[in-house]
Amino acid sequence: MKKTDGEDKLLSISQVAKTFGIHQDTLRNWEKKGLITPLRVGTRGDRKYRPEDLEKIMDDMSIVKDLGLPEADDGKMNLTQLKQFLWKSADILRGKIDSSDYKKYIFGLLFYKRISDVWDEEYEKVLAEFGDTEIARADYNHRFQVPKDCRWEVVQNEAQNIGQKLNEIFDKLTNANSPKLDKIFDDLDFANKDKFPNETIQRLINHFSKYSFGDTYISSDLLGDAYEYLIEQFAADAGKKGGEFYTPREVERVIVNILKPHEKDHIYDMAVGSGGFLLEAYHYLKDVAGEKKARTLYLYGQEVNLGTYGIAKINMFLHGLDSASIERGDTLSDPKFLNADGSLKTFDICVANPPYSIKDWEAETFKANKYGRITGYEMPPKKNADFAFVLHMVKSMNENGRAGIVLPHGVLFRGGAEGRIREQLIKNDLIEAVIALPAKLFYGTGIPAAVVIFNKNKSEARKGKVLIIDAEKDFEEGKNQNRLRKRDIEKIVSTYDSFKDVEKYAREIDLKELEENEFNLNVRRYVENGDEEEVIDVKSVWQELAVIEKERDAADKKVEQFIKELKY
């Protein structure tokens, strides 16, 4: 057979994958759409591709090469490759949509691709076992229901109105999986052509079509870890708004390692954000006791923001934690986790990083005290919701409950109603520890925060005492963001566990000393952090000032002389 011109430069399917990171399913999809035509080479008619044809398509779609993606023979990405791949999907939208907004669209598409590919895998597995298409399609053989007209291939083959088709598919998926997927896609509108021209959505679809996201190729742990990475990257990208849905994992780790979840614990986050605290609790127990026991945890969370609620739900699903109960609503005015008699449900562990110092909140509804949250306490200020969150958390702890909450430092020392609430919490012996964190740990703010640990069942040795820890100096400095290192986390946790004084770092304070200090919990009041006060030599300073003044006078005279010479 005559050799095709330039045959030596043609690429096989596996070579295309190695060179360009393009999955064979993506190639076939391009062939169906007429974007590329393979050459038939050799006696067997092997399919080969011209590199220049592939480069043209990739340039048109702005697909990035050299991601280090695996060959198409196994189609599996490792964690680093998966992180890169997912972050590249954001590049397609970056600059077209506000950085704080496009994350939910990426997450929505990723989740849709995942459940569609998993459905296909489940179908093929059951079909191979029973040889019956009806059984293979049966609802009970699938974790999520994906109707035929909702499969990923449907949007792959849609040419004109992809955005509208996606909206229709998300509605159908929600209905087919209600109440499991209720509200998850409600904040997405791909049909807005000002935001999403057809070409932009097509590029997103083509990008996600490169690889299968089924369980065979990407495990729940791998995809879950990559999803959490993506959340963190979006938080960094969004700046100040990033702090609204993301708490640094190191801070979550401090609190969870202090509270130490046990098998079958009920864990609640009243301001769940993207779900990081709940997942950290799961990861903690998985590390210390194994996955089987970690999956016995009961996880609960409430989130007021619709888009963030969807992100949290997807986060749980991608980690395989389908039983996690995430509800949408305002925790302070409309708490969702209630007992049959309408009272607040209580939990073994409560965790939260609520929004700081909200001025506009449903104070009047809270004051009505429907859930008994201010019984025994004063009403928090109408212009600051910090202690409203604290009192909600305290009321949500069961009789043996432990809790950890991230708060602004003002909560530790402000007076008025807040001071009286703090006094009562201390007298009720509910506060176990206060930990001052370094500045610039949180996205969008350089203000340092504190962690307050509550315990309704203190050990005898800790009753009537509060441990104050000053961890402000222990961190790794970054350009825009500081981080707690592993050793910093371990130091905080071990100090809490030992509950003993550590010079210039921690002090155990009794109720008498707190009372003498008017129940002020300001960390600097109790812990000398090692900063030596600068000794000022007044005489030397005056001498330096006199020299500076003489130099200034001489400069003024020169300026006056110049002005005279210029005849101004």
Describe the role of every protein-language-model region.
Residues 20, 93-94, 230, 260, ...:
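Generic helix-packing signal
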Residues 241-352, 357-368, 373-377, 387-388, ...:
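Conserved S-adenosyl-L-methionine
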Residues 113-126, 234, 285, 289, ...:
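A generic secondary-structure signal for well-formed alpha-helical elements
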Residues 75, 194-197, 215-219, 244, ...:
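Alpha-helix initiation/capping motif
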Residues 51, 61-72, 341-568:
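A conserved structural/catalytic subdomain of Rossmann-like adenosyl-cofactor enzymes
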